[in-house]
């Protein structure tokens, strides 16, 4: 299993539990609100909003919640003014960590994120210290049991996917950001079920971590992911096969 695939899978399994506590909905609402604020409330003309709505529907968010979040973004309803920022640093073993934040209090967010890095054997760096190690891409994970490789490859590439990669127990469909929804819809049309689809930051190269360091890295990533001001967390750590399987 690739390092990106490993953390993504752990994160989404964790998200299923978090959803019961409302954490996933909170993050999705923030993203929908900001997407509508920056690009308008019409998903047909706003790819970021379209992707955010699709993610919300995947999590079974009620339609009313989605519509309210859009209206808060467009100003039709009063809402919180979120600020978007990216923070960068290093985790255990020197692996890069990229943190996307949406917050109504930047000072609180910076302080909390810096504290989490320090507490978990990492350190927050300057802007630009690790961002260059990642590429922004669309990413769709398909369980091997859900599709034949040749069929998936044919459908995905025909729809505009950049690559289809094989991992231990999944296929990873990679797209340009603007092609993610088209490829997702093509998979839906071909009745190919996928575990999740998202816009992500794919690492260009990976940093191998041993069992102990992988466990430390997971604790850092989990703590960042649990921070109320954090939307997404990315790493180029190649995590040990022994972690995250429970």
From Swiss-Prot:
Keyword Transmembrane helix assigned to the entry: answer is: no
Q: Biological process GO annotation list?
A: regulation of DNA-templated transcription
**Pfam families under this entry?**
TACO1_YebC_N (PF20772), Transcrip_reg (PF01709)
Provide this UniProt record's keywords sorted from A to Z: Cytoplasm, DNA-binding, Transcription, Transcription regulation
- What GO cellular-component annotations does this UniProt entry give? cytosol
| Gene Ontology molecular function | DNA binding
Quote the subcellular location field of this record: Cytoplasm
Family note: Belongs to the TACO1 family.
**Name listed for the protein in its UniProt record:** Probable transcriptional regulatory protein Dole_0371
Naturally occurring in which organism (per UniProt): Desulfosudis oleivorans (strain DSM 6200 / JCM 39069 / Hxd3) (Desulfococcus oleovorans)
């Amino acid at each position: 299993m690739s390092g990106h695939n490993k953390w993504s899978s752990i994160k989404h399994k964790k998200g299923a539990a978090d959803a019961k506590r409302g954490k996933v909905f909170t993050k999705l609402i923030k993203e929908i609100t900001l997407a509508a604020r920056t690009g308008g409330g019409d998903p047909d003309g706003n790819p970021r909003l379209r992707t955010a709505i699709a993610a919300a529907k995947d999590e079974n968010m009620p339609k009313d919640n989605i519509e309210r979040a859009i209206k808060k973004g467009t100003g039709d309803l009063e809402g919180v003014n979120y600020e978007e920022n990216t923070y960068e640093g290093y985790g255990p073993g020197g692996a890069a960590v990229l943190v996307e934040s949406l917050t109504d209090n930047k000072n609180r967010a910076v302080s909390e994120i810096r504290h989490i890095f320090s507490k978990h054997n990492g350190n927050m760096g300057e802007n630009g210290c690790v961002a260059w190690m990642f590429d922004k891409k669309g990413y769709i994970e398909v369980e091997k049991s859900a599709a034949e490789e040749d069929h998936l490859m044919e459908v995905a590439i025909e729809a505009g996917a950049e690559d289809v990669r094989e991992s231990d127990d999944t296929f990873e469909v990679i797209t340009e950001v603007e092609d993610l929804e088209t490829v997702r819809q093509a998979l839906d049309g071909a009745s190919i079920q996928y575990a999740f689809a998202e816009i992500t930051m794919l690492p260009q190269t990976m940093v191998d971590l041993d069992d102990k360091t992988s466990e430390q890295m997971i604790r850092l990533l989990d703590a960042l992911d649990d921070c109320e001001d954090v939307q997404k967390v990315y790493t180029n750590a190649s995590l040990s096969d022994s972690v995250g399987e429970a």
